[in-house]
């Protein structure tokens, strides 16, 4: 089976969140008890992906390096690349071409939070897919804000539109995408900038769809997909995570726990990671976890 590498796109200027993001990347803001980027990072880890490229702005990349390092503390291999200007999501495959090499890849947006008991199982089918692409559809109340997928009676995707004025369905394409290695060449050779001057991920997905190689996995009831691009959605996401964690006593998107439970690191390493955090609830949670309660 081919290796699958991951990319987190954590660029952009975050203008919708000004003044909060005037001096700091949106993806470094807290979502309850963790930096935002922990959530998409955890999503890739839950898919079993350990080689991950983080793409950000020239000014923010050093901050991500300071926060996450080379990933070895979690049994990961993290690398970094700069996106000089926000020229579209699909530019990630051009920037990450050397990193991807001959492997398949997954892309997750740095401000997207995914939650659901069966999320690892849902991603497993996408990870194991030999060729083509998989995107994830989620029923939303305001589809005009997103890329929208339309289905026929058999559940096959028949159209994809970016932020349509008159959406043909309520199913938005989320910020999590799995592709075979063809995506690099598609991004480099087949894409032209859209009317807004960007290389659109929707155009990539449309090429796969027209080739009959696009799978759409449904995130149904019981899943949460949170897009944290506004002041209101930031606090809603924090409240959502807080409610689950306080009720269950279990953490959501805790990289240390995921790394431990997936066998990327051992209990001794968890202890090392918990040591500087032991005076707060996060560190105490890690120590309790390795004691088995």
Swiss-Prot record:
Cofactor(s) required, per the database record: Mg(2+)
Biochemical pathway: Carbohydrate biosynthesis; dTDP-L-rhamnose biosynthesis; Bacterial outer membrane biogenesis; LPS O-antigen biosynthesis
Keyword vocabulary terms for this entry: Lipopolysaccharide biosynthesis, Magnesium, Metal-binding, Nucleotidyltransferase, Transferase
EC number: 2.7.7.24
Tagged with keyword Iron: no
Catalytic reaction annotation: dTTP + alpha-D-glucose 1-phosphate + H(+) = dTDP-alpha-D-glucose + diphosphate
The protein's assembly and partners: Homotetramer.
Protein name per UniProt: Glucose-1-phosphate thymidylyltransferase
Organism per entry: Escherichia coli
Phylogenetic placement of the source organism: Bacteria, Pseudomonadati, Pseudomonadota, Gammaproteobacteria, Enterobacterales
